[in-house]
A protein has these predicted regions:
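Glycine-rich phosphate-binding loop of ATP-dependent small-molecule kinases
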Residues: 1-214
């Protein structure tokens, strides 16, 4: 059984690699956001508690996140393991899971330099009407600044503006550095395998690096 955590900054290609890893290991992809939405939709006592917390604008506690993860891992599709995309997000959540005897086998961090992330994300352009995506360097439109099909102007989303990307990267580093330290210690103690891969490689190159370690 493989219970895998996948970490990486926004724009590192986690979603693509998560899908490839899930296919390779025959495990479901699990995200904290999905679990919170499913809990609220279920109408359970825990779901109602989560709904009230989210409505108030507060953060869901590490204990509740831990309970949701523990419950999710008992479902039949997790028989071969699971892949957590982007979570746990804090050392508090990681410690809570360890205290609940939830065992992870692999923690993977996709590393990409900040300047490369900014280049990747700030180069994105989108056609608002259709959602068609372009990149000024990697997938440019035929006519700069305009959608190939409609000829209408493309926009840059707020989330993709360099100053916004840098803020998000700052938050990621603040949260993740203590988390990677936590899992490095667990790896050194033999509880799991923690490794970093170079996310600046091609999609297939990154996946090859990951699959060799699994």
């Amino acid at each position: 059984m493989k219970n895998i955590i996948l970490l990486g900054p926004p724009g590192a290609g986690k979603g693509t690699q998560a899908d490839l890893i899930c296919d390779l290991c025959n495990v479901p992809k699990i995200s904290t956001g999905d679990m919170l939405r499913e809990a609220v939709a279920s109408g359970s006592a825990l779901g109602n508690e989560v709904s009230n917390i989210l409505d108030s604008g507060a953060l869901v506690s590490d204990e509740i996140i831990g309970s949701l993860i523990k419950e999710r891992l008992t479902m039949p599709d997790c028989e071969n393991g699971s892949l957590f995309d982007g979570g746990p997000r804090t050392t508090g959540q990681a410690q809570q899971l360890a205290d609940m005897n939830i065992k992870f086998t692999h923690v993977i961090e996709i590393h990409v330099d900040d300047q490369d992330i900014v280049k990747r994300m700030s180069g994105r352009r989108v056609h608002p009407g259709s959602g068609r995506n372009y990149h000024i360097e990697y997938n440019p439109p035929e006519n700069e600044g305009y959608d190939d099909i409609s000829g209408e102007p493309l926009i840059q989303r707020e989330d993709d503006k360099p100053e916004t990307v840098l803020k998000r990267l700052g938050v990621y580093h603040d949260q993740t550095k203590p988390l990677t330290d936590f899992y490095t210690k667990q790896s050194e103690a033999g509880f799991l395998k923690f490794f970093r891969v170079d996310g600046s490689n091609t999609v297939s190159g990154v996946f090859e690096s990951i699959s060799k370690q699994l």
